[in-house]
Each structure stands twice: as C-alpha cells, then as structure tokens.
Amino acid sequence: MIPTRKKFGREKTNASAPIRFLLRSSHTARKNPLTFSRIKRNLRMMKEKGYFLSIGAGPNQVPLISAAIGLGYSVIAVDRNNHAPGLKMSSLRIMESVTEYRKILKTVSEIPLQGEILGVGTRSYGKATYTASYIADKLKLRYASLESVGICSDKNLLKETAKKIGILTPENYDISTLKNQFPFVYKPSQGSGKEGIRTFHDPKEWESFLKSKKKNSRSRVSKKKTNADKEEWIAEEYIPGFEITVCGLIQNGKFFPASISHKDVTKYAPYLEIAHTLPFLRCELIGEILLNCRALAAATKMNDCPFVAEFRINPQGEIYLIEAVPEVGGEFLADTLIPNYFGSSYFENLVKLLTGEKIEPFLNYSKIPKKYAGIFFSAPPEGKSKLVEHSEFVIKGKEKIIFDRKLKQHGEILRTSEGNAIRTRSIGVLGPDQNDQTLENWKQSVLQRLEGKFESV
C-alpha cells in the first residue's frame, strides 16, 4: 500500500481501505529556510536513530510517544481513532485497531521507510500487549515473549507458575463443592479493571447469586452467548489485608524496580481502586517483595519489557501474588506519580529498554522522604447511581495538585459492577514537605475532599 501525502493541509485517503497510513508533509516548510533546515536535521537524526512503533496513540499513550521523540526516534503510531492525540505527534500514522496485529505487521512491512524500526511498545493492556509481543517477535525486536504474555494473561496459569517457585497465591476453590470456604472471591480468570469481581461471605449469599444468575440466563431472548457467559470464572480464597503495586522494567533478565506504592480499594465489590500512595512504609517487606518480582519475571520468562505486579499482604506480613503482567500499568503511576515523587523518567527508560539502549536503575524508589504523594479517585456508592456534581476540591497547607481530571459528566448513570471504568474523577496530589499527619490520615482527608455527590436511581 502506498502512503498518501498531505497537500495544502488536506489528507488524501481511501475511505474504503481497511487500513491506511499517512505521512506528515514538509511541503510548506520549504518556503522557510530555517524550518526546512530543522526538518532536514530531524530527518538526519531519524536516519541515525530509526523508528519506534507505538501500538496505540490515545491519551495514555502520549507519554510513551513523547519519550521516544525526545530520544530522537521517529514514531509510527497505530490507532483507529483519527482524533487520537498521539497521531498528531507522530511521523507516520497507521489507522487500525491495536488488536489487528497481522494487519499492522503487513502495513509496517510495506512502508518505504528511511530507516529501521528499532523498537515497539504500548502503554495499553490486554490484547494490545499481545500485538506488541507478536510484532516484536516477527521483526526480531525486544518485548515480552508470546509465551510470557499467555501465562500472565491467564490467572490460573500465573498461579501455577508462581506456586512452583514458592510464591504464595490465594487458594483456588472448586465452585461445584463450595461448603465451608467462606468468604471467597469470585472473579473472571482473565480480564482487568476489577470488572465482575465479587466476594461472598456466607452460603445464603452464594445460593442467592446462583439462582439469580440461572434466572437471568433463562430470560435472555438471544441465543448468542454474551462475553460473561463464555468467560471462565474462578473462586479463590479471600486474603485479608492491604494491596501494593510494584512497577519496574526488565532488561537482559535483570529487574529494575521503579516504585512500590500502597493501594486502597472500596470496601464493596468489585473493589474499585481509589488511591495509590507513596511512600511505602513497610520497609521490612521490600526485600521479599523484590525477590518475588525477580523470581516471577524469570519463571514467566518476562524479559526486555515493562513489569507491573499487585500483591496482597495479610496481617501476618505474608505476601500473596494477585496479578503480574508485562505492561506499564495504568492509574497514572508511571507517567505522573513516579516522576513527580522520585524525579525518575520511567518512559525514557522504557523506550531505551525497548530499543536496546542500556537503562539506568531508578533511584530512591525505596527511600521514605518526609513528603507524601498519591493518585486519588472518586468512586460512586455501591450499586447503581447518578452523578449529581463533582466536589470543589480545596487544597490544604502546602499541598500541590499535579493534575485534576473529571472522568464522568453530571447526570451520567454509574454501575459499580462495571469496575474501575465508572470512577468519576482522578486527582494527583503532592503532600507538604513537613507533614504533621500520618500518611493514612492525609489519605483519608484527600478522599473526603474529593468525594462527589451522587443519588440513587
């Protein structure tokens, strides 16, 4: 397929084509010698550095694309949304879904490039990670192997792998013979974003759920099964305690930790994430946490890729693996919390990793400075409700707002069963250098000030 060039500000495209890519033109720049010389200099740099392929170009992908451009790479961005902000920043655009890995590979192979593709990556998750892995495999680039992605995307396979190397995981229960295993957690074997997760505390609650599920199944008019019908579900031991998130990178088999943050969730299922805070105060656990991460990376064959894992720590200090994937992870940790708290450039290191450059260790990830920081979310009450209004968030003392994003609009109907996607607002906050509150007290203060107004429907 031949690329079409912009002419006089318009793009000539074939609307019927299932996939297309567009070159940014320097036509108008020839009238300005300074601009033209800058473009020629950029082209020389591009030839020296080569290309970076970004699987996705949405808002969450912008930090990755920006880092690649900042390091001198010319970016090829893939996204089916013509208005994705990362497309405007990129030299080449492939208009396609990030899940269409074969089509993307075919198009990339047909582009008459002026240099080599030296790296591929994604800030997304799930199927986009598979696409990045597939293309990396075919183009002999760096990313987690397809085998590794397969293990980590299936909770049962991940548990089996973790158990073999001595990492604790919640025990699986046989759904057909549940008797005295209450409370237990019921969730999809694959998936993310907390959608569908529930906890059952007694047999009556479980029996009521099964009857309701059976009744709903019979009442469906369509013979087609929904995704929920087709999906495999698992029941597992409920682990009391708190959760942590570990972010890092793996290069040449070595794990580079970037942060260990404390995670808070709602008291009701599906346990929406409402806070990620620093510093992590349980210093005595850091060594074991990092040992688990290194062992897990080796056992799942993760290499030359990002790494994010979630653990649950019970009151006895025992560390249970909940999830681990070769992904950047979301929740504004890598792009906002880590750089603003530690001063580390996660995405610059990630691009270096994916293009074969040596990365430097993240500094200070385990130190406990006097300041606090966190990413906080406003979540609706359990069940179905309507957002009436957002709060007027007021800072206290020397607090500094990193960002403030309203994720939902007034009047929107929200169902907590849909997981993290129904949270209404997110805010990043740096606490004062000297704080007379405990981290827990400060956290609760921020969440109370952030809480919006909802009404039942």
Model regions: which residues?
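Active-site nucleotide/adenylate-binding loops and adjacent lid/helix of ATP-dependent enzymes
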Residues: 153-234, 239-240, 251-254, 279-291, ...
